[in-house]
Amino acid sequence: EMRGGTANCSVIVSDKDVASPLVDKADVIVAMNLPSLDKFEEHVKPGGLLVINSSIIERKSTRDDITVVYCDANRIAEAVGNPKGANVAILGAMLEKEPIVDIDKMTEAIRIELGERKARFLEGNKKALVAGMEAAREQ
């Protein structure tokens, strides 16, 4: 999120060459706040996935042609002792419904990104990732 508006990032996961980094309609959208949901909800392809941070967003999706997961990401992060881990919890929810990356590979990517200096945060991030997956599994 960004003061006064929304921030977004497009990620294309493919085992083929990517012709263009631009995404008009997405298979998956993660909305961390209401302005992002309002702006990007219609950009999910029919049959796609919308993951909503229900800790911050109270409204429900208006779409009936997509899968919607409501992830109480902030509460999950607090519950596992990683209060800054809402983004990792919601990533776990997304991966549960759209397993584009193996959980072990994602955990390894988090470890590498944290590096030695922040290695103490790895366990909290693992817990948030798994708890987010479990929350999505129940929906």
Predicted regions and their residues:
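Active-site cofactor/cluster-binding pocket
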Residues: 1-139
